[in-house]
């Protein structure tokens, strides 16, 4: 999973204007980087120009996907990733970037400019392109799910480690003196109920 490009554009009008951008082209050969970078800028500019206010869209081009979010304020975010990068974290990140950009640079600063300048750059993009290579950093739900999956794995390993070699939970339940007869019966009934659903 990889993010190659993050861009913020002034949209609306015939041609979108790139206000701030960052690229991570380290995956490409030295001599390819310039051409790939130019293509990504061209692609981002084109899709930003052709995305209506309030729209989100993902456009596949070769091995890449351009995630685009155009806001009603006249600003648009573009994220170019590989095909494995999940869609929800991509749009979560775009929303965060556009929110922060509008706070740092109100519309009055960029609405009438004819070309970009350093004053309109968003310095956090350099941090974001490395931090959010891991999509779970952008998506809190995905992060919680990942933590739950890790906990589940630890629990399964713990139960296996508690049981000695060749020992089975059924035998431990039968030998247990701390379980009442009704608890033992409940365990056996629950096991039977669960086993009837197994497809072999």
Swiss-Prot record:
InterPro entries in the record: Longin-like_dom_sf (IPR011012), Longin_dom (IPR010908), R-SNARE_YKT6 (IPR045848), Synaptobrevin-like (IPR001388), V_SNARE_CC (IPR042855)
Propeptide: 198-200
Residues covered by the v-SNARE coiled-coil homology domain: 140-200
Residue numbers with lipid attached (S-palmitoyl cysteine): 196
Modified residues (Cysteine methyl ester): 197
Pfam families given in the database record: Longin, Synaptobrevin
Keyword Membrane carried by entry: yes
Keywords: Cell membrane, Coiled coil, Lipoprotein, Membrane, Methylation, Palmitate, Phosphoprotein, Prenylation, Transferase
An annotated GO cellular component: Golgi membrane
GO biological process: amphisome-lysosome fusion; autophagosome-lysosome fusion; endoplasmic reticulum to Golgi vesicle-mediated transport; Golgi to endosome transport; Golgi vesicle fusion to target membrane; intra-Golgi vesicle-mediated transport; intracellular protein transport; vacuole fusion, non-autophagic
Superkingdom classification of source: Eukaryota
Lipid attachment, kind S-farnesyl cysteine: 197
One GO MF term: palmitoyltransferase activity
SUPFAM superfamilies, per the entry: SNARE fusion complex (SSF58038), SNARE-like (SSF64356)
Sites of Phosphothreonine modification: 158
EC number(s) on file: 2.3.1.-
Official protein name in the record: Synaptobrevin homolog YKT6
Species in which this protein is naturally found: Saccharomyces cerevisiae (strain ATCC 204508 / S288c)
Lineage per the UniProt record: Eukaryota, Fungi, Dikarya, Ascomycota, Saccharomycotina
